């Protein structure tokens, strides 16, 4: 496995530009475009130091979103509409039962996007492991949080990431599969990955796991990861090709 580069900051230092508490907005179920507009507005305000850092907590009605590296062969075969977005990555699905969090965070200088992504992953890994999936970790070369192959299932992604940083402020974020259906993934090449699977916490734990169970623990772990109280560790259990490397950006 290729050794990751060292972050710009010490592992125990905050990656945030501010020490003020993060404000959390619990939004319920929100149309994707409405949430995107809200993020853009908040990011502009945060860049001007008019508001504190935010984390938006929500779910979406069923929708496909296509990041900048989405390829024609990734697109859905079931006729559902696709929203082209300004985050990184390729195509994914959002819908009921999937916990979505969008941190609007002003990053400290010098901005280290890779470290920010690793801290998002670290928070997710901590939360998922605490909930009873101790094997959860990373696949080198691929973003997100993964569960190793077991019981006939391949290595499977349980949480996806896609971010954008503009004027030093983060947008978009993470999606954690709790008790959502996986059927909508059957009609796309999710994140451009054809040689792995997808899973939910409900499937891994053998019980229904609603999104509400994960909100407070994940918020706490994100806060700790951003602050450096939860430090990034090597949780990689496999390596695989990066499905976005060297692909052209859309538009």
From Swiss-Prot:
Give the GO molecular function terms.
lipoyl(octanoyl) transferase activity
- Kindly list the residues the record flags as site (Lowers pKa of active site Cys): 157
Which biological process terms from the Gene Ontology are attached to this UniProt entry? protein modification process
By sequence similarity, the record places it as follows: Belongs to the LipB family.
BPL/LPL catalytic domain spans which residues?
A: 49-230
Record's keyword terms, sorted: Acyltransferase, Cytoplasm, Transferase
Q: What GO cellular-component annotations does this UniProt entry give?
A: cytoplasm
Provide an example Pfam family for this protein. LplA-B_cat
Q: What else is known?
A: In the reaction, the free carboxyl group of octanoic acid is attached via an amide linkage to the epsilon-amino group of a specific lysine residue of lipoyl domains of lipoate-dependent enzymes.
> Where is the catalytic site?
191
Where does it live in the cell? Cytoplasm
Q: What class of enzyme is it?
A: transferase
Catalyzes what? octanoyl-[ACP] + L-lysyl-[protein] = N(6)-octanoyl-L-lysyl-[protein] + holo-[ACP] + H(+)
Q: Which HAMAP family does the entry link to?
A: LipB
The name this protein carries in UniProt is Octanoyltransferase
NCBIfam families, A to Z: lipB, PRK14345.1
UniProt gene name: lipB
């Amino acid at each position: 496995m290729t050794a990751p580069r060292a972050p710009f900051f010490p592992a125990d230092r905050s990656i945030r530009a501010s020490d003020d508490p993060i404000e959390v907005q619990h939004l319920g179920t929100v149309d994707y475009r409405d949430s995107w507009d809200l993020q853009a507005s908040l990011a502009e305000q945060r860049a001007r130091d008019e508001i504190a850092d935010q984390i938006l907590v929500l779910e979406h009605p069923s929708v496909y979103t296509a990041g900048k590296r989405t390829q024609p062969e990734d697109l859905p075969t079931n006729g559902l509409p696709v929203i082209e977005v300004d985050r990184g990555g390729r195509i994914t699905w959002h819908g009921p039962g999937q916990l979505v969090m969008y941190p609007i965070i002003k990053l400290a200088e010098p901005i280290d996007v890779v470290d920010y992504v690793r801290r998002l992953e670290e928070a997710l890994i901590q939360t998922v492991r605490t909930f009873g999936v101790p094997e959860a970790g990373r696949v080198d070369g691929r973003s997100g949080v993964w569960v190793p192959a077991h019981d006939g299932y391949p290595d499977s992604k349980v949480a996806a990431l896609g971010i954008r940083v503009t004027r030093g402020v983060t947008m978009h974020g993470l999606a954690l599969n709790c008790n959502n259906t996986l059927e909508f993934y059957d009609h796309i090449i999710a994140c451009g990955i054809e040689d792995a699977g997808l899973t939910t916490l409900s499937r891994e734990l053998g019980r229904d796991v609603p999104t509400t169970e994960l909100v407070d623990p994940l918020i706490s772990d994100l806060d700790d990861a951003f602050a450096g109280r939860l430090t990034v560790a090597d949780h990689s259990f496999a390596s695989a090709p990066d499905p976005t490397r060297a692909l052209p950006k859309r538009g």
